[in-house]
């Protein structure tokens, strides 16, 4: 463990085998409930006023929830990682055991897949946190899409940046 941050000192790729088999959902432990998360983060000025949006749908395309959060003065990459963590936490807290993430951040997608190294200390801490959560979900996937294919999440991220007083602690519109 890194004594300064309380996070693992080494990084693991999504494609590395889990440290313990119990980290992943056990085979035959019930039906897979997969949530689809369109995520986006942004910062005006980069760094600057930042926020993220998460648009969550079920496997039939029905809206499950939308999340927006204002993050204060941050970078766009910090906001992208924060959106991913919000999607992971929502899935786990609401009984979904699988997650498919769609993002327009090539950097985030390639870092989570292990194709790029995480060099920024701020992002490394978020990356490690995301990887701990990812190992608890099966199936998990992440894919890159063009910005035009991620409009709902972009709208929510911009709404967070436009409404910091409403989204400072996070805003969740849950369809349950």
What is the predicted function of each stretch?
Residues 1-27, 31, 163-165, 172-176:
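N-terminal intrinsically disordered, compositionally biased regulatory/targeting segments
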Residues 16, 63, 67-69, 113, ...:
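RNase H-like, Mg2+-dependent phosphodiesterase core
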Residues 56, 125, 169-174:
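Compositionally biased, low-complexity linear motifs
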Residues 66-71, 86-87, 130-134, 171-176:
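Short C-terminal domain-edge/linker segments immediately following a structured domain
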Residues 73-78, 82, 118-121:
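Residues at secondary-structure transition points
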